[in-house]
UniProtKB/Swiss-Prot annotation:
GO molecular function: ATP binding; D-alanine-D-alanine ligase activity; metal ion binding
Pathway it works in: Cell wall biogenesis; peptidoglycan biosynthesis
One BP annotation, GO: peptidoglycan biosynthetic process
InterPro entries from the UniProt entry: ATP-grasp, ATP_grasp_subdomain_1, D-Ala_lig_Van_CS, D_ala_D_ala, Dala_Dala_lig_C, Dala_Dala_lig_N, PreATP-grasp_dom_sf
Recorded catalytic activity of this chain's protein: 2 D-alanine + ATP = D-alanyl-D-alanine + ADP + phosphate + H(+)
Role this protein plays: Cell wall formation.
Protein's name according to its UniProt entry: D-alanine--D-alanine ligase
GO CC, any one term: cytosol
Family statement drawn from the similarity comment of this UniProt entry: Belongs to the D-alanine--D-alanine ligase family.
Keyword Manganese on entry: yes
Domain annotation ATP-grasp: ranges: 134-344
Species name: Borreliella burgdorferi (strain ZS7) (Borrelia burgdorferi)
């Protein structure tokens, strides 16, 4: 008998459109597998209302919210639409950014007692916050580019002291980032103190916590991992960016890969670099208690060859140009089998958790 799978996408997020593209790729894989009854659920970008769709398309069909059935969640009873219990067996969330990768949806599904593809609450929440994630990774002796972080309140209290720290601790140029946002949105490179204030103000539009890092000339290496306690680390790939300062949002989604953006899979690395990248990816995945999947991004400094972990994505992109699935495919795991494996990991993780908590006996 087929399992009932809910594919959740969209979301109140700056990465809404990317989520829709990722969902379409996964939807096609699920159709090809023919193992699941698929319930696509679209989260409206403005209202956050959940709607049940018949299918997923790319480009998305116009959404008529006046006629689409709304999805409601009743803890202890199930997920309903049109007064019918959908009897969902597993959920595959592909909501990028806020509410999707920060532990929010994962928390809701844990309350609902439904298996969920990907990381749990803690791993999602920590990984999504670049500042707290870096603090934790630093405690595990994982190399990071020098950084500082601060809250909006601290900045308005003493912005001159923070600008002084940027100059003395990091030195220019630096990268200014909102702590919680993906797809390189809201990120700028400041080459002098004259630029830093405007870039901090821009980043504060997206989040209340800011991370500032030393800017280095580096290769951008990515590494895919899947699994729970036992994990598989795939051969890393490299994103070669030729017409951009770094792999920002425009480079990722506004440019057709070609002369400007080149994907090298596998990446051309020295043996010691390859082993170090896989080791750091393993340590991050393990110590942040991740499960299901992640894409771990690294910098390799061009002059010295020094490796730095950049960030971790617990719901990586699944679009046709996304590196996560491409790296898996390069090592022999085809897209539909990747999707199937991720669903299996969700069931395994759920069973392991239920073994530890049983209030009925």
């Amino acid at each position: 008998m087929k399992k009932n799978l809910m594919l959740i996408f969209g979301g109140v997020s700056f990465e809404h459109e990317i989520s829709c593209k990722s969902a379409y790729s996964i939807y096609l894989a699920l159709l090809d597998l023919n193992k699941y009854n698929i319930y696509p659920v679209y989260i409206d970008k403005c209202t956050g209302v959940w709607y049940l769709l018949d299918s997923v398309s790319d480009p998305p069909k116009p959404i008529n919210t006046d006629v689409l059935p709304i999805v409601s969640l009743l803890p202890g009873f199930g997920i309903f639409s049109n007064n019918k219990n959908l009897e969902i067996d597993v959920v595959f969330p592909v909501v990028h950014g806020r509410t999707g990768e920060d532990g929010a949806i994962q928390g809701v599904l844990k309350v609902m007692d439904i298996p969920c593809v990907g990381a749990g609450i803690i791993g999602s929440a920590i990984s999504s916050n670049k500042y707290f994630c870096k603090l934790l990774l630093k405690s595990f002796d994982i190399p990071l580019v020098p950084f500082i972080g601060f809250r909006q309140h601290d900045y308005f209290l003493d912005k001159e002291e923070i600008k002084k720290n940027v100059k003395e601790v990091l030195g220019y140029p630096v990268i200014v980032k909102p702590a919680v946002l993906g797809s390189s949105i809201g990120i700028n490179v400041a080459y002098s103190e004259n630029q830093i204030e405007s870039f901090i103000k821009e980043a504060l539009k997206y989040d209340l916590t800011i991370v500032i890092e030393k800017f280095i000339e580096a290769r951008e290496i990515e590494c895919s991992i899947i699994g729970n306690e036992k994990m598989k680390i795939f051969s890393p790939g490299e994103v070669v960016v030729q017409d951009f300062i770094f792999y920002d949002y425009d480079a990722k989604y506004s440019v057709i890969p070609g002369n400007s953006i080149i994907f090298n899979i596998p990446a051309h690395l020295e043996t010691n670099q390859l082993l170090s990248i896989k080791e750091y990816a393993f340590l991050a995945y393990k110590n942040l208690e991740l499960r299901g999947m992640a894409r771990v991004d690294f910098f390799v400094e061009k002059k010295s060859g020094t490796i730095y972990l950049n960030e971790i994505n617990t719901i990586p992109g699944f679009t046709d140009i996304s590196m996560f699935a491409k790296m898996c495919s390069n090592d022999g795991l085809q897209f539909k089998d990747l999707v199937d494996n991720l669903i299996d990991y969700a069931f395994q993780s759920y069973i392991n958790r239920k073994k530890r908590i049983d209030f009925e006996n």
